[in-house]
A protein has these predicted regions:
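Short loop-to-alpha-helix "cap/lid" segments that border enzyme active sites
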Residues: 33-134, 138-160
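N-terminal active-site wall of soluble small-molecule enzyme domains
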Residues: 1-44
Length: 160
């Protein structure tokens, strides 16, 4: 079976623990300003998000070193993730703290992924995984099954 991932952003630890016990999560994915101590306190593998915008990118090296994976996502002003907008992927190889993460191969990419750009991302940057949502919708909140199938086909073609 595929791993079950719970996605959280600055939630109280009690809330995360309750969701974990109900759903028996395999991974926790943190999108906020969660500390290393907080993330490790659940004794569950975790994915930590680094939000990439126009400002300097801050990377908590201890937190990222201990994460099972790092997720790179777009930040627009104060909105972290869920923007449907792609960040400048060249930062993955031009920004020093991100280069180190890329070298490990333990990273996922989110933010503005769609049928028009996914092949370029996969060929150029080779992420371990993808987090896609609005790029596969025909209207807000409604997934387009044809787009989803085509997207998966592109990913599988690049994975072989």
């Amino acid at each position: 079976t595929k791993p079950l991932v719970g996605v959280f952003m600055n939630q109280p630890a009690q809330h995360v623990s309750e969701i974990m016990s109900i759903l028996r999560l395999d991974y926790l994915q943190f999108h906020g300003s969660e500390s290393y101590e907080y993330c490790k306190s659940f004794n569950t593998p975790f994915i930590k998000t680094i939000h990439i915008g126009s400002d300097k990118i801050f990377v908590d090296k201890i937190l990222i070193k201990n994460a099972s994976m790092t997720l790179f996502d777009t930040q627009l002003c104060d909105q972290k993730g869920g923007t449907g907008t792609r960040f400048d992927w060249s930062k993955l190889i031009s920004e020093q703290p991100l280069q180190e993460i890329i070298k490990t191969g333990k990273y996922l990419v989110a933010g503005g992924l769609n049928l028009d750009n996914i092949n370029d991302l996969l060929v150029t940057y080779k992420p371990k995984g993808l987090d896609v949502s609005s790029g596969l919708e025909h209207e807000t909140g409604k997934k387009d099954h044809e787009k989803m199938e085509r997207f998966v086909d592109i990913v599988r073609t690049n994975d072989s």
